[in-house]
Amino acid sequence: MKLGLIGKKIGMTRVFTESGNSIPVTVLDVSGNRVVQVKTEEKDGYSAVQLTQGYRRKNRITKALSGHFSQAGVEAGTVIKEFRVDHDIGSDIKIGSEISVELFEVGSKVDVCGISIGKGYAGTIKRHNFSSSRASHGNSRSHNVPGSIGMAQDPGRVFPGKKMTGHLGNAQCTVQNIEVVRVDAGRGLLFLKGSVPGSKGNGVFIRPGVKQPSK
C-alpha cells in the first residue's frame, strides 16, 4: 500500500488542454501535510504513516493530542489521518518532515474519500432513482409514491434493506480512479478531473488508486 495525503476542497474550475478542450476539475489544497508518527511492524504490528494538516491553537486541543504533536515536533493540526503503507515506504519517512503534493504525478489515478453533501430527508425518486408514476389516466395522489413495499400476510413484514425514503447524503464515500490533471507544487494544489465528495472547505483523503484499470 502507498502513502496518501490529506486535502481540503477549494472548489471547481476548468483547465484547457493544448488542443483547446475544456476539462472540469476539482481543486484540492494538500499543502502542509506533516508527519506526526511512523508505525512499524516490529513496534506496532503494522506499517503506517500518520499525517496532519492545517493549524490549530494549543488551547483548542486536548492535553493528550498536544503531547502527541509536541513529541513529533510539529504544530498541532486540525485533522489527523493514518495511511497504511508498505514496510519499505515507512522506513524512508522521517517524523516531522513534510510530504509534498509531488507525491502524485500528472495522469495517475487516485482514490478520494470524503463526506458527501447532505440532502436531508429525500424520497425514493431522488434517493434511489425510482421512476414516478403516471401523471393522469386514473392516477390520483400517487404520482411520487414508491409503490408496494411488501407482499401479503406471508411473510407479513418488510424485508430489511428495502429501498425506501430516508436520509440522503452526509455519509463517507469514496470515488475511485480519478485522473490527476495538474500538480501545482508551488502552491500545494492538486487538480483532479471531475468532482469529488463534499462541499467547499470539506476535508478529503487522497491516495493512489487501489483498483487500477488494466490497459
Swiss-Prot record:
Keyword Ribosomal protein on entry: yes
Residues carrying N5-methylglutamine: Q153
Cross-referenced Pfam families: Ribosomal_L3
Tagged with keyword Isomerase: no
GO cellular component, one term: cytosolic large ribosomal subunit
Superkingdom field: Bacteria
Residue span of region Disordered: 131-150
Modification comment: Methylated by PrmB.
Record GO terms (molecular function): rRNA binding; structural constituent of ribosome
GO process terms (BP): translation
Biased composition (Low complexity): 131-144
Keywords recorded for this protein, A-Z: Methylation, Ribonucleoprotein, Ribosomal protein, RNA-binding, rRNA-binding
Assembly: Part of the 50S ribosomal subunit. Forms a cluster with proteins L14 and L19.
NCBIfam families: L3_bact
Function according to Swiss-Prot or TrEMBL: One of the primary rRNA binding proteins, it binds directly near the 3'-end of the 23S rRNA, where it nucleates assembly of the 50S subunit.
Family per record: Belongs to the universal ribosomal protein uL3 family.
Protein name in the entry: Large ribosomal subunit protein uL3
Lineage: Bacteria, Pseudomonadati, Pseudomonadota, Betaproteobacteria, Nitrosomonadales
Gene field: rplC
